[in-house]
Amino acid sequence: MGAIVLDLRPGLGVGPFTLGMPICEAFAQIEQQPKIYDVVHVKYYDEEPLKLDIVISFPDHGFHLRFDPWSQRLRLIEIFDIKRLQMRYATSLIGGPSTLATFVAVYALFGPTYPGTYDKDRGVYTLFYPGLSFAFPIPSQYSDCCHDGEAELPLEFPDGTTPVTCRVSIYDSSAGKKVGVGSLMDKASAPPLPTGSIYMEEVHAKLGEELFFTVGGQHIPFGASPQDVWSELGRPCGIHQKQVAMIDFEMGYAVFTLVDQMVIHSASDPRPRTTLCADYFYNYFTRGLDILFDGQTHKVKKFVLHTNYPGHADFNSYIKCNFVILVGGSFPDVNNYKNRITPSTKWEQVKEILGDCGRAAIQTQGSTSNPFGSTFVYGYQNAAFERIANDDLCNSQVMKNGYIAT
């Protein structure tokens, strides 16, 4: 595939990708244009998902998107092969196989700026504009062109040539930071959320009592009706009847496999058995939340709070829920609580707070094609926690007067 053309917006984004956008929105843009973004790599550190960026890479187009691992918002766009991506700025094009992004060409297009910085160890000179930087490799024989870390602009070598950019960085400039290669890359951060945004809103969960949404001020107690939930949170993104878990026992563990509603025939009993369940979920994907209603009483009986960590089969189905499960205090004064369980809490820390609960139930997600493998579900009174193999929580279930229930 030839080089594509994307609009360059310094300090804002490139093409359909905007700094600060949640990772779910980036995937939605990708899915809308499968012929353009036909090769997509998702990279993350599976041992410590919160330690390094989540990266969406487009190797055929020479750029990738870096998402903050905690907020899952786009913090940095890096173009690492400028020959594979052509950018449109105003009415001019730069990059791609036909328009070299040389130092002179960049300087002519974007105008004069302050002298950049020279990294002698890397042999790279970086030129900065608000929300935009260009890195240029400097051959060792010309390193003396950058006197005291600076160079005369536009940069040209004694033989009449000018360097071609090796990396372009697009980042939020509101904090006044300069972002480039190496350690300068870590300075990029997602732009501030707009006032009143509910993205990453803290959701306080009091075991056995209610959820409280700290930005909007909504309270959803156990026993609330569907009408109560609609009036507080609005129309759900989806409504689904609860799936039923088929339970087997392997090596002393209970193995839960989620199945769809179906008719099951037994060789010894030709009469069909169904897995119909009257309970149903309200799905709030944009809040990272599911609410389970009792099919008989139509009252809230459970909340499912999703972390949206990569490495789980539900990754990218929900926006991350920034929940805070409050343990050992008096509601609603959250400052009185001795312990809190959040999406960043490790499973070992959960056990320190709530105690050991014994062996886990293994959940297979009902698919042999799931590349992430099974998860482990641990039950306590009024709560259950699902974790992936690396000890991170992938969702938390808050219920009332009950133990683990699939």
Regions found by a protein language model. Give the residues of each.
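Short helix/turn-capping signatures at newly exposed starts of structured segments
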Residues: 1-406
